[in-house]
Amino acid sequence: MRKLSRREVLACGAGLLAGQSAPAQPSKAPIIRTVLKDIAPETVAGATLFHEHLSLAPDFMPRWMALASGQAPPAAATPTQGFFMEDLDLMAEEMSATLRDGVGCIVDGGHPDMGRNLDFLKRLSAKSGMPIVASCGYYAQPFYPAEVTSWSEERIADELIRQASEERIGAIGEIGSWDEITDTERKVFRAVGKAHAATSLPVFTHTGIPGKSAIQQLDILEKVGTPPARVAIGHLGNLVDLKVEVHKALCKRGAFIGFDRQGGAGDARQVPMVLALIAAGYAANLLFSSDLSTAAKLKRHGGAGAS
């Protein structure tokens, strides 16, 4: 049997039965669990973008931007009329263009606490032909549902396992620490590790800018038994270091690292880091994506698009 590449290993959700109401059972072969069907890794016709957002609540990015700039988040939700992530035709146009650019699969990094609409992802995949992987998880402490603070890590893990068994979920992510990692975020990371053990779903993370807590995230996950080869530590392109010391430390342990905000002004400063990692022998550990999240990034609006 053909040996899978590291990228295919990360993409494969190997632990769940496809049916929504059937109990979880091991899959006999590696699969990619998309929102519509399970597919074999070798059938993906193009690159996989491991961290995009195709469905978010209208108020998510205004809240995110306010918190990132140290301001109070908006008091009321943004009206949904005309919101681009609720425009099926517009998003299908974008996904069709992304397919033509050579992308063969997209992993959506949203989940309920970010306003992800799973039904929309299914309709988007069906209309555009783009295989889409949906995720489960809890983003970062400023966005956690209130109950997460009081729940035990076992309760959080059980909830993630429930989501993965009842819905077509193919990954756990994006799981984040907002700035310095908090005790509650540590609890969520431990729960994610336990959910991974029960589901085999790969994990991808959000690190606070510029890449804070990257090593700590992998430490927590590995301590509860998550193999580093099943983890992608995200937003490492924001950690600008020509010596790529943190990047190499993560790769040496077997983890993937994400350069996942591509398509903007910061790309040029990341090229030397990518070249340094390739020269160090870590090309197979590198994952790329755009973290699509705003209308300005769409091709129709003059942006680079997901591809």
Locate the predicted segments by residue:
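N-terminal secretory signal peptides and thylakoid transit peptides that target proteins
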Residues: 1-17
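Alpha-helical scaffold segments that flank or form the walls of functional sites
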Residues: 41, 45, 50, 55, ...
